[in-house]
Amino acid sequence: MRDAVTSLIKNYDVAGRYFDRNAIESLKSYFESGTQRVQAAKAINANAAAIVKQTGSKLFDEQPELIRPGGNAYTTRRYAACLRDLDYYLRYATYAIVAGSMDVLDERVLQGLRETYNSLGVPIGPTVRGIQIMKEIVKEQLGAAGIPNTSFVDEPFDYMTRELGEKDI
């Protein structure tokens, strides 16, 4: 798992180059947003249970067939597994926010997830929608916590959505 800084260093080291203007700007941007990234992680941590609960509620309101008999979140065990997975996505998105890199998502979330879900018969579409809903809720929470610019929060959620969505359908 790498953060934005170690990823940048690795790329320039492999090329045998000094940092150019683009690299310096990337580093500057990462460090300037560092305080907001940490504040975001703190706010997400303090509200994680509520974020997951709201995400699940909204997802099941939008797609009630998931919790009806025969639905993928029908039964207490499956419902709990869905919420557990949402919590998992939130936790790793938070790591990616702080790191400023999506490497942790590739290494710990996305590798093998699609195959696992397919083998268990878990539909990817509602998972992707749940991640999108979660992003919206997180951004609302961060706005309420006084974090004005939350654009950096989009990246991990959009990345998971894109990676899961592209490869399943």
Swiss-Prot record:
Gene Ontology CC: phycobilisome; plasma membrane-derived thylakoid membrane
BP terms from Gene Ontology: photosynthesis
Keywords: Antenna complex, Bile pigment, Chromophore, Electron transport, Membrane, Methylation, Photosynthesis, Phycobilisome, Thylakoid, Transport
UniProt PTM comment: Contains one covalently linked bilin chromophore.
Sites bearing N4-methylasparagine, chain numbering: N72
Membrane topology, record value: Peripheral membrane protein
Residues the record lists as binding (2R,3E)-phycocyanobilin: C82
Function field: Light-harvesting photosynthetic bile pigment-protein from the phycobiliprotein complex. This is a protein functionally equivalent to, but with weaker absorbance than, allophycocyanin beta chain.
Family, similarity comment: Belongs to the phycobiliprotein family.
Subunit structure: Heterodimer of an alpha and a beta chain.
Protein name (database record): Phycobiliprotein beta chain
Organism: Mastigocladus laminosus
Upper taxonomic lineage: Bacteria, Bacillati, Cyanobacteriota, Cyanophyceae, Nostocales
Encoding gene, per UniProt annotation: apcD
